[in-house]
Amino acid sequence: MAASNPRQAEISRKTNETDISVTVDLDGEGRSDISTGVGFFDHMLDQLSRHSLIDMKVSALGDLHIDDHHTVEDCGIAIGQAIAKALGDRRGITRYASLDLAMDEALTRAAVDVSGRPFLVWQVTFPSPKIGSFDTELVREFFQALAQNAGITLHVTNLYGANAHHIAETCFKAVARVLRAALSPDPRQLNAIPSTKGTLNG
């Protein structure tokens, strides 16, 4: 499937607030080249790439003199659009996945349906409003933008945790791992769209 039909895409998105370019290879090795100007966010996107095995290049110039919000949200939009473009008609994918992921004291559950129907259920509370200078509320904003633009139904629940960095990192890693599983080809139905409707485009 991957060899004859490369699942790769490039997206450029420019507004008055941000200028973003993204390339993805869904059948990669988890290589990343991330530069958003937001250090903690770069670290999280590296984790997303590494653990999903999606090769990802993200370059962003944003209005960081205001805050990080536009850059983080717009990266979610562009990455989501790139994933959707690379998936095409979503033929042959596994579609569903769920996972509990631990990091020290934190445990987070993620579940995904690559359905073509965008939706986010977010049950994550952070013990502090910031991780360094990064606003923790932006973690949700990123995943909201990602889900809406990738056309996926995504549930993320932090079951417990005390360290805000660990909670955020388990969210990114758990989502990465369920994307890795759900986007993988299903060897038993490589040429089929995994839906009784015959479409995964909404």
Curated annotation (Swiss-Prot):
Keyword check for Zinc: no
CDD domains reported for this sequence: IGPD (cd07914)
InterPro entries, per the entry: IGPD_sf (IPR038494), ImidazoleglycerolP_deHydtase (IPR000807), ImidazoleglycerP_deHydtase_CS (IPR020565), Ribosomal_Su5_D2-typ_SF (IPR020568)
Keyword field: Amino-acid biosynthesis, Cytoplasm, Histidine biosynthesis, Lyase
Pathway as given in its UniProt record: Amino-acid biosynthesis; L-histidine biosynthesis; L-histidine from 5-phospho-alpha-D-ribose 1-diphosphate: step 6/9
Compartments, as annotated in UniProt: Cytoplasm
GO molecular function: imidazoleglycerol-phosphate dehydratase activity
Keyword Metal-binding: no
Catalytic reactions on record: D-erythro-1-(imidazol-4-yl)glycerol 3-phosphate = 3-(imidazol-4-yl)-2-oxopropyl phosphate + H2O
Alphabetized PROSITE patterns for the sequence: IGP_DEHYDRATASE_1, IGP_DEHYDRATASE_2
Cellular component, GO, one term: cytoplasm
Main location: cytoplasm
Any one biological process term the GO annotation gives: L-histidine biosynthetic process
Entry similarity comment: Belongs to the imidazoleglycerol-phosphate dehydratase family.
Listed name of the protein: Imidazoleglycerol-phosphate dehydratase
Lineage: Bacteria, Pseudomonadati, Pseudomonadota, Alphaproteobacteria, Hyphomicrobiales
